[in-house]
C-alpha cells in the first residue's frame, strides 16, 4: 500500500508487454497503412480497413489519400506520431487522418492483446508477468481484503499512452466480485 500521495508518470510504450505497439511500432504501422497505392483501381499497398474507414467517414477521399502519402513519407523524420501531427497541424486532413490511424491501430492492438478476453472481458492472468501485476501487488500490499477500495487512494497515474491497457487492467482486477466483496 502506498501510505503517502504518490504520482506515477507512465510513458508511451508501457503497454508493450501486453501486446500493444511502442511508439516506433505505431509509427511503422501508420506509415505502411497510409502509403496507399492503387493499380487498375485496386488497392495494392496500404491498409484496406483504414481505406474503408476513410470512405465511410469522408465524402471526398482523394485529399485524404494524398494526405496519407505525405504523412507516410515524412513520419519517420519525427520521434513520435504526436510530433509528426504537430508538424502538419496546419493541414487538417493530415491531422484528421493521423488521428484516425492512431485510433484504428490502437483499437486493433487492444482487440488482439492477450488481455482481451472473450465477450469484452479482460484476461487478467495474461498480465501476470508484466509490470501491471507488480504494480497492483504493491498497491494491495499491507491491506486487508475489506480495505481493497482504499488501495489507490494515495495514487495518481499520469498516463501518456494512447491505449487503455492500464485503465482496463486496474478496473477489471479491482472488481468487487474478484475479491468476494459483494
Model regions and ranges:
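Active-site periphery "cap/insert" segments of enzyme catalytic domains
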Residues: 2-6, 38-182
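An N-terminal structural lobe/cap that precedes and organizes the functional/catalytic core
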Residues: 1-49
Amino acid at each position: 500500500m502506498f501510505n503517502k500521495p504518490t504520482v506515477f508518470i507512465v510513458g508511451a510504450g508501457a503497454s508493450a508487454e501486453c501486446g500493444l505497439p511502442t511508439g516506433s511500432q505505431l509509427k511503422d504501422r501508420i506509415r505502411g497503412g497510409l502509403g496507399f497505392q492503387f493499380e487498375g483501381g485496386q488497392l495494392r499497398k496500404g491498409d484496406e480497413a483504414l481505406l474503408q474507414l476513410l470512405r465511410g467517414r469522408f465524402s471526398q477521399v482523394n485529399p485524404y489519400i494524398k494526405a496519407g502519402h505525405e504523412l507516410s513519407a515524412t513520419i519517420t523524420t519525427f520521434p513520435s506520431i504526436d510530433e509528426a501531427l504537430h508538424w502538419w497541424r496546419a493541414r487538417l486532413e493530415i491531422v484528421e487522418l493521423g488521428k484516425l490511424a492512431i485510433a484504428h491501430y490502437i483499437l486493433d492492438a487492444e482487440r488482439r492483446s492477450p488481455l482481451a478476453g472473450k465477450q469484452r472481458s479482460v484476461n487478467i492472468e495474461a498480465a501476470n508477468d508484466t509490470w501491471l501485476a507488480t504494480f497492483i501487488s504493491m498497491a494491495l500490499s499491507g491491506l486487508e481484503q475489506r480495505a481493497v477500495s482504499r488501495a489507490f487512494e494515495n495514487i495518481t497515474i499520469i498516463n501518456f499512452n494512447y491505449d487503455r491497457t492500464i485503465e482496463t487492467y486496474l478496473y477489471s482486477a479491482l472488481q468487487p466480485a474478484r475479491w468476494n466483496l459483494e
